[in-house]
A protein has these predicted regions:
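Extended, charge-rich, solvent-exposed interface segments
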Residues: 122-146
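Short nucleic-acid-contacting surface segments enriched for D/E, G, S/T with interspersed K/R
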Residues: 83-99
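OB-fold/S1-family single-stranded nucleic acid-binding modules
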Residues: 104-127
Length: 146
């Protein structure tokens, strides 16, 4: 085997390994979210971004003193949400929802949504998150938020 072929093969292995690690990190729940920090909150839908690789739900959550805090929730990819019965217009701006999930490790006002519930009807919409849930909600309850 020539040195040129050996170098090319070694380079290919290094590049593929790097891509694999980057891909794993991007899709790793544990890298971004803390499963020891469950949360449940209710707020008003302000925006839904129906994009790949994840759908994002933005909600204003009431705070003490009448103010609100904007939160962003990562959900599963559009095709998984569609399998669960979601459509682009499943939620409307101004609709009140309750969301269960896990807070981001960096402490920001972002979270991975596990379950979205319409407050008015009690209808549960699975969020198809990357935390290993079933499509219709959850195979097990989210631990109580502290």
């Amino acid at each position: 085997m020539s040195a040129k072929n050996t170098f090319a093969k070694a380079l290919a292995v290094v590049v593929l390994a790097g891509v694999s690690v980057a891909s794993y990190a991007h899709h790793s729940f544990a890298a971004q979210y803390d499963d020891k920090k469950p949360l449940k909150m209710t707020g008003t839908v302000t925006k839904v971004e129906w994009t790949n690789p994840h759908v994002y739900l933005f909600v204003d959550v009431p705070q003490k003193g009448g103010k609100t805090q904007a939160w962003g929730f990562e959900m599963g990819p559009p095709h998984m949400l569609q399998k669960a019965g979601w459509k682009k217009n499943s939620l409307t701006i101004g609709e009140e929802v309750s969301i269960e999930g896990w807070q981001a490790r960096d402490g920001s006002f972002t979270a991975n949504a596990r379950r979205v519930t319409r407050t008015a009807t009690g209808e549960v919409l699975g969020a198809a998150s990357s935390a290993g849930q079933t499509l219709t909600g959850s195979s097990q309850p989210v631990p109580a938020a502290k």
